[in-house]
Design a protein with these regions (language model features):
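Phosphate-binding/switch region of NTP-binding enzymes
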Residues: 67-151
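Glycine-rich anion-binding surface patch
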Residues: 6, 58-59, 81, 167-170
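Interfaces that engage single-stranded nucleic acids at replication/repair/recombination sites
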Residues: 11-18, 134-152, 156-178
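Generic low-polarity alpha-helical segments
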Residues: 26-29, 80, 178
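Short, surface-exposed, polar/charged, turn-prone segments marking secondary-structure boundaries
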Residues: 29-31, 55-58, 106-107, 145-148, ...
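Generic recognition of cysteine residues
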Residues: 20, 36, 74, 78, ...
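Conserved inter-motif catalytic segment of the P-loop NTP-binding fold
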Residues: 1-67
């Protein structure tokens, strides 16, 4: 375990990923990347000058952090907090308030960068809101178990053994595959 302390800036996370890689770790779990986004929002709020222009000081730091996750030699699992809200659901003829997660506390569309995104509800059941592996797409909610982890690991290992594609050598310059 490599514990981070405040401030939770992107550079600290980037360094931590490097330390984990150097230590030979195969899997890194970052709990949570929402702390980094909160730091960047506070950083932005405290900058002087034009708020819109100040995003130019924030975005490269966020992008470097996400790229470091994506380019890691390790498997990286990230957690994110979600904004909470209550909804009323009918149960046995009564309206019961239930807490629901709405959106990840991170930059908009960050989920695009990940292979699988599980939304975990208050009962600790997961639903894949995004799944490039197609292992969990369209499935009803389920508990995250060791078996789920093994399915993901098997998928990762199958992808590792696929032959690499050498882009740009299959077709002469200027020609497009039909």
């Amino acid at each position: 375990v490599l514990s981070l302390s405040e401030p939770y800036n992107p550079e600290k996370y980037i360094d931590a990923i490097g330390i984990c890689e150097s230590a030979g770790m195969e899997v890194i779990i970052i709990d949570s990347i929402s702390h980094c986004w909160d730091y960047l929002l506070d950083f932005h709020a405290n900058l002087q000058g034009n708020s819109f222009a100040n995003w130019a000081k924030v975005t490269p730091r966020q992008n470097a952090f996400i790229q470091r996750i994506l380019n890691s030699s390790c498997h990286v699992i990230c957690t994110m907090r979600s904004k909470q809200e209550y909804v009323l659901n009918e149960r046995n003829g009564k309206m019961i308030p239930e807490k629901v997660g709405l959106k990840a506390v991170q930059r908009d569309n960050v989920d695009y960068e990940f292979t699988i995104v599980f939304d975990v509800n208050m009962k600790h059941y997961a639903l894949a809101s995004k799944d490039r592996t197609e292992l969990f797409a369209g499935k009803a909610e389920f508990p995250l178990t060791e078996q789920v982890g093994m399915q993901i690991l098997d998928w990762c290992n199958q992808c590792r053994t696929q032959p690499s594609v050498n882009y740009g050598t299959s077709y002469p310059a200027g020609r497009v595959a039909q």
